[in-house]
Amino acid sequence: KKRLEKYTVRITKEIIDDVKTLLNFMGVPYIHPAEGEGEAFASELCRVGYVDYVLTEDMDTMAYACPKLIRNCVDKSLKRKDIVSIFDYQKMIDGLELSHEQFLDFCILCGCDYCPVVPKIGNITAMKLIKNYKTIENIIENTSSKYTFPENYLKMVNDAKINFNIFKDKINIDSLNLNTSEINIEGLKNYLINDIEMNEKRVVTTLKKYHNNYK
């Protein structure tokens, strides 16, 4: 546990403010919701057509019924830097021959942020069980002698379903506070070098690479 904790990052207000400052200098529009999971909020924005895609490495996002997900944009292990993975939610569940409710049960059964993994049930077994029994409730009723489900598992499942639908049909697009700004290359350069203390040569080289107007 201690070893894994070294790889975790606690998101503080200071980090959030730094990200906002960076986005402002870069001229990237952003929305900062007051509460809730970012993937949940972004997935609903995509579902209602406010954004075209959600960019994330967290595959739990598909459990929010995110219509279009882009992954591997920041995966440094990939040799090709011009390739990303795009997941189409509707095509995916159609290909799996699952309803949204069944796919959500499958995701929860595999283990997620809100529900633990059930011993001896991996992705392949979870899919077989969902295909056979359709719901987690039916799976528990018919296989409790074979699998050991955690205490209060059904309550955790129901809580997970609430969380995965937390923003569904609850975002008023007209009242969203979209923060916008013009790109400020000199401001960005000074911020990265003086405030973030990045190497000046690296900053200048990167800015020239990604912004043709920068001299």
Predicted regions located by residue number:
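Noncatalytic, basic helical substrate-engagement surface that gates or grips nucleic-acid strands
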Residues: 1-36, 41-45, 67-69
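Short amphipathic alpha-helical molecular recognition features
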Residues: 7-11, 30, 34, 51, ...
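Long, highly charged, low-complexity intrinsically disordered interaction regions
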Residues: 34, 46-116
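Positions that flank functional sites
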Residues: 38, 61, 208
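Short, hydrophobic/aromatic alpha-helical segments in well-folded domains
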Residues: 41, 50, 122-125
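Short secondary-structure transition/capping segments
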Residues: 43-46, 65-69, 130, 212-215
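Non-catalytic nucleic-acid-binding/docking modules located in mid-to-C-terminal regions
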Residues: 83-215
